[in-house]
Amino acid sequence: WVSSCWPILVYMFMSSKKLPHLKPLGIIALPSAVFCIIEPIMFGLPVVMNGFLLIPFILTHCITGALTYWLTSIGFVGKMYLNLPWATPSPLLGYLAAGGSIGGAVVVFINFAIGMVIFYPFWKAYEKSEVQKMEAEAVEA
């Protein structure tokens, strides 16, 4: 989830001046996101019914999953052999599940960076759309 959830959280905080209604959601979602509980973002933003965010959410998982598989197959990351609780924070999960391989934690940060790059144009389009909605509502009022 680090490749698709954390970029959304980062962009939510970065956009808090243009879209002030996202900051409280980000503050509420942050503690649970540390432990891989992303429902506040999935249904609060919402990602689920939002074409701007659903497309990169799915795309990011496909790309980072394939990359992680490839990095494991070439030996950069040790094979995952520990079954840890799903709520373990992501960098720690990567490190421990790979048997203490630092490569496991490094891959988590690589996946996060890839998620940031993939989400950027989609987030900008979402942000622009939301700003236009807010301006239209202000004109009506």
Q: Where do the model's predicted regions map?
A:
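Transmembrane alpha-helical segments and their short flanking loops
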Residues: 42-141
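Helix-loop-helix junctions within the multi-pass membrane cores of secondary transporters/permeases
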Residues: 1-57, 61
